[in-house]
Amino acid sequence: MGLTSFEFGIFILFGVVLYYTVFRGQQWKLLLVLSYLYYAAADVKNVIFLLAVTIITYTAGCILDRDMEKKKRKRIVAAALFLDFLILGVLKYTDFLIDNINRIFHGNISMLELVLPLGLSFFTFQSAGYLLDVYWKKTKAEKNFFRYALFVAWFPQIMQGPIGRFERLAHQFEGTHRFQMENIERGLQLILYGLFKKMILADNAAMFVDHIFHQYETFDGLVLAGVLAYSIQLYGDFSGGIDVVRGVSYLFGIVLDENFRQPYFAVSITDFWHRWHITLGTWMKDYVFYPISLSGWMGKLSKKTKKIFGRKKGRTIPICIANILVFLLVGVWHGAAWKYIAYGLYNGIIIGVSGLLTESYRNWKEKLHIAPESRGFHLFQIIRTFILVNISWLFDMADTVGQALRMLVNLVTKFDWSPLFDGSIYADVPGYITYRYVQFLAIFIGSAVVFFISLQKEKGKDVAAWLMSVPFWKR
């Protein structure tokens, strides 16, 4: 059941009706049943992996909640996390490993062609975050297995996030949620806006992108147009999906974390990752970046670098290394291919180098008499960041790192948009002349609507609240 499917809409409708009528006293139990039904509808065999991750982290959490010596606690959390990520690693990265072994050693090991369960990365990270919070005593372990199972499997977010935190999500499943029209209206607003972004904006941009990059050597002068369209497609599809997910949760009175906050208004790559896939970024910060930065070996490295490079640079270098390692992991998380590793390193290196050059940037701005708070400089930062982000999308679009680099070269050396206007890019599409104009119009209008709403939100205006204050017949 895709988020835009008719079946999904019927599933939600029946779920909401039952939630506020028949199951008013046991709502969380209905949500658990709905979550497992939804997941099983994709492939019932995948429920095994969902249950395995749930059982491992639930059991370890209950054990960690007891009084015991530090070494034993560390062994338990390490073992549970190893098993947790072993499932993810084997299913997601085995064929990638086999392929590289075959390439390096000229081997002929057969691919296992394992099917990756939907949402595995999301619920693995979510359950691992819960376990680490219990280990660090930031939260108490959930003793009720079925309530914990609902936290891991909550169906709106299981496929594409946001990655939930136990202390903010689990308690919302407790008690009785009364029917509130405000939740229904806000939920429907988010769902409709998300569907608009996915179906009007992303789907039309995707067809355009596919025509260019499936024949990128033929249309090598259209890389710029293609990557701009891809930035629209990716944002529309991903943020639109999150809007639908959050909207569905609102219908049940459950508020999920925000996952996108006007990312294309970011003024740096660091700022971009504070706005794009926010819950992945905060997960990496809390459970990877801080543990690495505060580790013993990083402390030793910091002392050595301070002696060699001075106090300021010496303190910054370990942080830069930690950022690069974090984004290497972000790349690996995105997929089992070298292009995703390159994508992660690209972001990590830019953030790391930016950290090292912070003092130099400040000096340059003073010498050039640039006012950091001026509108002109703010706009320059947004454009610069947007360019850097779009370069990173080349690694996501391409099949290989080499292909991404060739596209990058074409981006700056070749510029030929004539196939857009003479129709040759759509030569294989019946009635392409009408199709071309309808598609361009949909992308243009969709982008304008999303840009306007994003601009209002960037200014601090609550568009949803304003819309809800308008009489229904005027909307």
Model-derived segments and their meaning:
Residues 1-451, 457-475:
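Membrane-embedded transmembrane alpha-helical bundles that form the catalytic cores
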